């Protein structure tokens, strides 16, 4: 009998994933990754995952499924690999996606190492995505429910990780999953979806960074493209490319953050048209398909919730250059670019 570790957050998705695996005859254990103590990072228990309530919800589902359940303490790794990187990226002028780093380093690295230690065969999660084995290679596919598709945050999976991962929800919609949970009497059937960034539930990234890092980031100048001073900003980490709201500056016309000058602690403002990019360079690129020799025509996403846009991609040394058929707005350092061909993920990397 094949054995699987179910990554359980206490939410409905991972709970139904556990149910499906049990129904398909796998020997399963449930595991919640304890990533941080809420009090340590200054947030209330009820606002986020990793709370005692979430652990109890996961434990209750595991008990209902007659499945052993464990809590794995990954706090040190989460701090080093996710939170420290989150702060560093903002300090370097980028806008990070911590969900990608959590998947890369915790769910599919640390948890998979635990899988190996326990001599289990698979890690199972409640992601809305799918895996297909075709022509000697494991391929990552979008989930059936496009409104919930999470393939964008999974591009970093290696061939080994794909071979030892199962996404049981890939062929279902969210409504179907909630219905299954209700039919099976799960206490979390109508539980709200978790926050995108679990450790900043109120969305105030700058406040979190200043509290966690224990320092205040200095004020500086807003400038235009020519370096003319337009006003004062309240700390460079408070701004991201494309931002218009919260600038607290009145110039008589709309302005947006178009760049950051870290050396001089300046935030550059410009027009909406100034945000358009015709190409980007991505590092730390992971090809899920075989690495192409030349240029490929495909589709790209530079943000989680954006519509795919047509492009041409090619390797450029150890990086990948992506040239868009039409200019793309607010391409942002630190975010991911993910390439698609229909329902298949070709690969992805970090925008530089």
Residue ranges and their predicted role:
Residues 126-131, 136-352:
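AMP-forming adenylation/ATP pyrophosphatase catalytic core
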Residues 1-155, 166, 175-176:
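ATP-dependent adenylation/nucleotidyltransferase module used to activate substrates
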């Amino acid at each position: 009998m094949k054995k699987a570790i179910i990554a359980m957050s206490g939410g409905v998705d991972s709970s139904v994933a556990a149910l499906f695996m049990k129904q398909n005859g796998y020997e399963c254990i449930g595991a919640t990754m304890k990533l941080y103590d809420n009090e340590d990072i200054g947030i209330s228990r009820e606002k986020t995952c990793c709370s005692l309530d979430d652990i109890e919800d996961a434990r209750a589902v595991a008990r209902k499924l007659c499945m052993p359940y464990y809590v794995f303490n990954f706090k040190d790794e989460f701090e080093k690999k996710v939170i420290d990187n989150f702060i560093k990226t903002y300090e370097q002028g980028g806008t990070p996606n911590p969900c990608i780093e959590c998947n890369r380093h915790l769910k599919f690295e640390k948890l998979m190492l635990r899988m190996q230690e326990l001599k289990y065969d698979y890690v199972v999660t409640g992601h809305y995505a799918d895996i297909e084995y075709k022509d000697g290679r494991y391929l990552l596919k979008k989930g059936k429910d496009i409104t919930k598709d999470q393939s964008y945050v999974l591009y970093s999976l290696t061939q080994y990780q794909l071979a030892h991962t199962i996404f049981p929800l890939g062929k279902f919609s969210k409504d179907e999953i909630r219905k299954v949970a209700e039919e099976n009497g799960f206490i979390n059937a109508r539980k709200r979806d978790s926050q995108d960034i679990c450790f900043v539930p109120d969305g105030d990234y700058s406040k979190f960074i200043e509290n966690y890092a224990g320092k205040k980031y200095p004020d500086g100048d807003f400038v235009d493209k020519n370096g003319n001073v337009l006003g004062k900003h309240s700390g460079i980490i408070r701004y991201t490319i494309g931002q218009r709201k919260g600038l607290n500056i009145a110039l008589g016309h709309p302005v947006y953050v178009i760049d950051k000058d870290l050396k001089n602690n300046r935030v550059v403002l410009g027009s909406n048209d100034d945000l358009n990019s015709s190409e980007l360079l991505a590092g730390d690129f992971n090809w899920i398909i075989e690495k192409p020799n030349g240029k490929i025509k495909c589709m790209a996403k530079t943000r989680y919730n954006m519509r795919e846009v047509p492009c041409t991609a090619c390797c450029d040394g150890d990086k990948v250059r992506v040239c868009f058929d039409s200019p793309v707005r607010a391409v942002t350092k630190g975010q991911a670019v993910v390439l698609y061909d229909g329902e298949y993920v070709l690969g992805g990397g970090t925008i530089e």
